Amino acid sequence: MQGNERIQDKNEKEKAYAPYLDGASVSTDNGPILSVFALQEIMQKIRQNQSDMAAHAPDVDGAIPEVMTIISGIKGLLEEKDYKVINAPPNSFRTIPMQSTEYVLQVNTFYERMSEIGGPIDETDPIGFYALILEKLKFLKSEGAFILQGIATKDYRGAEIADPEIIGVSFQNALSHLAAIDRQIIQDTLNGMIIENGLVADRNVDVFRAAMSDPIYRIHNVLQGYIEGIQYGELRESVNWLMRLGLRKRIEFANDFLTDFRRADTIWIISQRLPINANVIWNVPRCHIANLITNVALCLPTGEYLMPNPRINSITITQRITQTNPFSIISGLTPTAVQMNDVRKIYLALMFPNQIILDIKPDSSHAVDPVLRMVAGVLGHVMFTYGPIMTNITPTMAELLDRALSDYLLYMYNNRIPINYGPTGQPLDFRIGARNQYDCNAFRADPQTGRGYNGWGVVDVQRVQPSPYDHVQRVIRYCDIDSREIIDPRTYGMNMTYPIFREMLRMLVAAGKDQEAAYLRQMLPFHMIRFARINQIINEDLLSAFSLPDQNFDVVLHNFIQGNFGETDPVVLEVSWASIWFAFVRRFEPIARSDLLEAAPLIEARYAAELSTMQMDVQQLRMMRARVPDTVINATPSQCWKAVLKNAPEPIKNLMNLSHSFSFVNVRDIVRWSQQRDIQESLAYVLNREAWAIANDFEDLMLVDHVYIQRTMLPEPRLDDINEFRRQGFFYTNMIDGAPPIGDVTHYTYAIANLQANMGQFRAAIRRTLDDNGWIQFGGMLRNIKIKFFDSRPPDEILTAMPYVYTEEERDGVRMVAFKYATTATAYFLLYNVAYSNTPDTLITVNPTFTMTKIHMRKKIVRRVRAPDVVSQVNKRLVAYKGKMRLMDVTKCLKTGVQLARPTI
């Protein structure tokens, strides 16, 4: 008993380290496992090629990313909404009380909050500037992308009026400083803000007016218009497309999720649109490997490797006691783990023709078993396709298989089987047979006709009926098998054949290989089931936006043979001779479809929408670079790309860089991608487009290029009449209403400033201009603006701040100077407060205080208004949905396997 236990423990250890050395046991593979396996093999191949190259190539060493984690992250993005539902619009204006009872200061809080976004701009850091722009855009979209529901109202004399909390103006803190008559005027104005009943299509809504900053209102208006379009057309188009996709993929529609969109109390929103514009996904630079791996992980079904009936061997190639033919010699072999990995590669190549192709693994020790090699030469001609449209193997492997088949036919030469050699001496250039000789040239590879392999004599790529995806209209028909046929493993494949298989049987019979011909004849049903399943997987499960477009698919083989480099060059994986035999005696049998298959359309749509948004960002940043060259002096097109990637969601960025392709993206790729016109329409894209339209006016982002230097005395008024001084609400700001006359402005470029600094006259020139009461502008670059309020004298670092940084130092006895124009400008507001005990000269100092910086903006951020006019900004029309209405985002419902109640329009 102890001996048996030791043997059992030893067997368990062997199984732990070599899972494919336990007899007929085989593994189960699914999409995620095969995707990681394929990515590992592809990255290993890339690294090996780079190590063999004489020239230096970018290093791509790094951890292999977890594909399913990335896809789950993109799926998680579907849970994020591009809008928020609130019960009151944000306060866009706040009121600052003054000592005056007639005037108050009203501040546009949007610009105040926008000024706090980001730090100082550095003209030597373009990526930082681009990141600042994108951060401000994100803030703009988050501020304006809201939906109003259940607003606070109250009754007044039989009318429903707006609660002061929802009008967008905060003024309660200033009421105590106002006169009673002004407070009454404000109250009467509030009582007149009646909530009106309106209709959006046939949905009842509340319509009212509120104060709102123009940028926020534009974003909100676009969102509201997107919803008010009701999107019946988009919904109907999406559902019809999903039905077509379900018909193609054989996905039954379930009835467990029914939504009646015609209910009058339901407002529904579609943030993603179907069908997907797959060109957006395939326009990404260096994306073909990432899309291939994603297609594997997203759509490939779970399957297991089944072996044929063992009686086929016993009645054909192993019926004799003495095993002398090659097939019988290797029939009892068990694959190792490495060989099973090669089997995986073979089936990946069969499922992804023209994307993954195979080559024979070189053996540096020259120890290839000749028996395995010759058997692989026979089976390779009925396993693989080599032309005329698609291929599974390289030209080198096709030639090696031809040689192996030639050697097999000449193996164990029998004088009773005459052979007539041809004149060329090439592999298979001979006729074999006694009475009816067979010309073996019919099996020599020819990619133009597919001769010698499965593609000969059949139409294996067809375009029969329109596909749900416009970019993939092809239907793969290995061995001329229709993927729509019902496959019953008990009967399917009987009495079926195809041209190259018939020719193989004829050639084997002519060569006297009757046992091998009988074996292949018995294996034919198993062989046909293999390719029928592969056809089904390719044409149904693997059909997605990540499938290789037809225009690229059709030219892969031609480019590969001619040595032309294309955008989607195939990935070459190496396999051993033995793995061809093990792949032939196993077939991939799907046992369960991918769990992500029903959510795949939405994952594709979200990915494409994010790509379109990123593409728009790159386009706009490149145009911004041309508009403000002084702000980004050393900018390159690649820095726009890097800044956008830095701001992109992490799952999107990881999927784009799935194969470490970012190490190889160049400026040409970036420029070409940014100029593509294909887009994936979505709510996020629409909001981003409007945000960029707003950002065309830099002042809406609190970026200003009109910053000047002029020496001005800080006002020090006499207090002859304190009551009058208080009534006027006296304040001072360094923001000017209009730009100074052009003739009075001295424009300092970098060249002028450096020239004067090198001559040692920079400070003197600046002083002379200021003494003449002149204006100086340093460059035309954008500066971030900060807003501050003071009720006493501002600190000197603000009053004397200059819109440049001038540094001077000695380095190795040489005087060095440097300029930096990228500084943060401060727009300050000084509110004068006085008491009745103050004397007339309380605000006057013996030595005057000077302020240096002046800022010109067309936007009125702070206004002094009369007390009754604090609600004068309430002029924007807003729509709010009633509290009992249902706001439903039906985007997550748009997936295959879920039947929606289609609206009848």
From Swiss-Prot:
UniProt keyword Lipid metabolism present: no
Subcellular location: Virion
Protein keywords: Virion
Parts forming coiled coils: none
GO cellular component annotations of the record: virion component
InterPro entries named in the record: Inner_layer_core_VP3_Orbivir, Inner_layer_core_VP3_Reovir
Chief location category: virion
GO molecular function: structural molecule activity
Family membership noted in the UniProt record: Belongs to the orbivirus VP3 family.
General function of this protein: The VP3 protein is one of the five proteins (with VP1, VP4, VP6 and VP7) which form the inner capsid of the virus.
Protein's recorded name: Core protein VP3
Organism: African horse sickness virus (AHSV)
Lineage, highest ranks first: Viruses, Riboviria, Orthornavirae, Duplornaviricota, Resentoviricetes
Name of the gene: Segment-3
